[in-house]
């Protein structure tokens, strides 16, 4: 079962003006980004679990583990926002984020395992133009890595 997934930005990120502007992130744009990142995590975890031979269910029950996660310290160098101001963003990386993930007994809520990891987008030697599609591609790559780690650890536990 895939449970709650929350997303939080780096503590100063939302307060900083958008690249190339004097405008700050609108609350609705920030929420869309959080929802998109949470959706990517849910999608990739589900895909990896199913590919690994695990059944993903919607309800708690006997012998059901619940995966819950928080993406924290999310930092995006070129956020996708709806704004009249157009600014090109050049950076060495699309951004970074940290995951705090837990496996719980789905009935009792007891935490059986907890893990933390920092994921960073590919870095280049010199700044390059950051696009919205690069943001999503890099975020997906980080999240796919986390999904692979989850399945690998579940497989190792299953063998013991």
Task: Tell me what each language-model feature is.
Residues 42-54, 76, 147, 151-159:
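Sec-exported extracytoplasmic/periplasmic mature domains
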Residues 1-38, 128, 152-160:
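A structural "domain/chain start" motif
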Residues 4-12, 71-75, 118:
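Generic short beta-strand segments
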């Amino acid at each position: 079962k895939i449970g709650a997934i929350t997303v939080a930005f780096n503590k100063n990120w939302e307060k900083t003006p958008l690249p190339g502007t004097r405008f700050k992130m609108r609350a609705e744009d920030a929420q869309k980004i959080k929802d998109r990142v949470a959706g990517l995590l849910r999608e990739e975890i589900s895909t990896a679990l199913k590919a690994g031979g695990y059944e993903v269910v919607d309800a708690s029950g006997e012998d059901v583990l619940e995966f819950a996660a928080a993406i924290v310290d999310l930092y995006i160098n070129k956020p996708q926002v709806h704004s009249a101001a157009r600014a090109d963003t050049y950076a060495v990386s699309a951004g970074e984020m940290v995951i705090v993930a837990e496996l719980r007994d789905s009935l009792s809520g007891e935490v059986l395992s907890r893990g933390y990891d920092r994921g960073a987008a590919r870095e280049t030697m010199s700044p390059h133009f950051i696009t919205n599609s690069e943001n999503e591609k890099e975020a997906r790559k980080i999240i796919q890595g986390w999904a692979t780690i989850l399945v690998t650890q579940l497989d190792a536990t299953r063998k013991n």
